[in-house]
From Swiss-Prot:
Protein name: Protein psiN
Cytoplasmic side: 701-746
Ranges that cross the membrane: 680-700
Residue intervals annotated with topology Extracellular: 24-679
Chain intervals with Polar residues compositional bias: 717-746
Glycosylation sites: 97, 124, 319, 353, 380, 477, 553, 628, 654
Cellular localisation: Membrane
Family membership noted in the UniProt record: Belongs to the prespore-cell-inducing factor family.
Domain PA14, chain residue ranges per copy: 125-276
UniProt source species: Dictyostelium discoideum (Social amoeba)
One matching Pfam family: PA14
Membrane topology: Single-pass type I membrane protein
Amino acid sequence: MGNINKKLFYFLIQLITILIVLSDDSYNSLLPLEKDIAVIIRDLSPQTNPDFEIDNPNRVIKGLVKDQLNEEDRSPIYCCGDDHAPNIDRNRFVIHNQSTFYSWFHNQKDVNIVISKSLVFTRNVTSDDPRIYSYESDNFFPIDKMGFEADSYNGPIKKNQWKDRWGFPRNFHFCLELHASFFYIGGELFSFKGDDDVWVFIDNRLVLDLGAPHDVSGQNGQGSVYLDNLGLEKSKSYNFDFFYCERHTTDSHIMVETSIDFKCKYYDYCGVCEGMGKCCNPSECYGSLPACGHFECPGLTDIAPNVDWRYHCKVVVPNCSLSDTFCVKHQCDPDSKQCVPSTDYQPCQGKSNSSCIEARCDDKMGGCYLKSKPKDQSKNDTTCYRETCNEDTSTWEYKALCEDDSDKCISKKCIPNSGCSSSVVDCNDNNHCTIDSCSKDTGCIHDPIENCVPCVEGNKCSESSDKCQQLECNPYNSTTECIDRTKKNCDDSNACTIDTCNGESGECENTPKQCLAKNKCSTARCNSKTGQCDNIYHCDDGILCTLDKCSENGTCYYEANPCDDGDQCTIDICLNTLTETGGCSHSARVCEPKNSCFTSHCDKKLGCVQTPIECPVEAFCLISFCDNSTKKCMTADRPCIPDDPRCQYGVCDNDTKACIFKDYDPLPFKCQSAAVKAAVGVGAGAAAGIAIGGAIALGLAAFGGKRGYDAWKSSRDNQIQTSSENPLYNPNPNQGDNPLYAANNS
């Protein structure tokens, strides 16, 4: 037997074994030749959205969407708000704004038409990873004669105006989205090549960014994601979200290759795999509403897919009391259906008994507090002025305390921060021939003395060195006698002054006591009755729930009292009415779970802590989890992860409560033992192509020759693109000898 015939013999033995194994239905169901992947397509038009047929930069532009997916509706978030998306220069752009971008992936009446489709992914039997599936088309027009191009469409959009490079009318302008989930096993990849915009999110993170219209020449419009580089956790379920738009003539290309095992956790009521209910518009809901009620969309899985959701909307009446505070009560506005502050609620009414003092309310300041109308700061010395409110004008009026002239025998003046200084009017006219007295009504009186003798020359009575102790001539005998008058009285009836008489001038001196202020925000004052110093603190605003502060430069400022007790499980508030506790109140904090997938409890140090719920599971080979989109517990098959997922797959056994790992059969050539590779005797590269290339195809090739293989290829709708994929046509695949080529061409 020649060398070629020996190789062929060993190969046919191996091939027969493969054919027998592939007849096993369990293996075929594990890795079917085809998978239908559900997608949603929105037909758009340059007439409804100017982002389509926009100037073509013919290059990928990154950063058109944000790195994080909008988890509320699993849609990409436009990068730039109301601004244009950037392009290669300032004068051109590829997206107008967030409003035009919105209709790419959201239902919008008269702007887009929603079409449900599925893409058939085919297992790549020539790959060294049996999990690889691909979808490829160089004429990707999945909604030709649909949407705006459908015969039944009678709207304003012009039909059949966009043609491909061969002149055939095509439905060029659409956006596609695919939502699924997967259990990360290890070794998965996702590759794409095509036009135009493509974004891929895994675990809500952007992992492939191919934005803007572009062609597929060279490396343009292609990229790959290796999931092992994403920091994913094996056996954990992750969301997968794929977005694709065809925005520009004249070609449409798509090539997707992936080993990710897509699953659909649920279908929403719109019939979309892992959809977020985008078909729902609450304004279209059917039913009656209370005065302040409004409609909300149903829960994603509350009704069966494609059931008319308009009859199943939720009626929601807002509980406005949840927004109430001490100062603000809320009520529902029937027009806006929103909670708004009540204009009738006056919590501080009657709290003030003066029109010069306003009763105000501020929750940060503890509720009701009193605020004075503006005062004259030049008259704020209460030792000199008494303030009163003019209730008619609601203004402060001031009366000087030391300007009382009802007693003309008493002289009064105000000493700042010490009060009134009162002294007896000095009625001495220095005339010994008068009797000096004082009337409180008229003041000083000087009555002449009859038969008064003038002072003789040389009388020394007026030459006293102490002018506070006055001497004057005896009006009846002025020769030698002097009359000693009473020492001058300098008592001003104010305990805050030191009263003395200046002997040289004879004037009274009433010197204020020195009182020192404690800080720059205080004024030192003396009590005119006791003579004791008092400190008047200007920063006391009289509000229990504020902390009165004084800055270094003497400016008063006020901080809300936090009443912090150091316990994160209490709600600490301050109310001015709680005088017994200094205003502070500490009520228990109620921790609400953020959704039905969580429970919540309070930790004194951390506050409210969210804990995922444990969903019940009925068997070892099932796992359960709470889905963040539906907020419900779901069940899935337990993933069994082999050491090398490209060579083995895992099967869960409920009886043994263990995962069983089996080799793929036929085993990919890269996974074969050295003995098998030697027995086949084919170069490693060629054998890889032959062994994994599909046992059915190889069987036809081996036993039916070229014609049998070509007939099978034709029956598969040209899924194999070139004749060179037939091993009978390739003498040296990957630099190795092909025994089938030699045997069929000898």
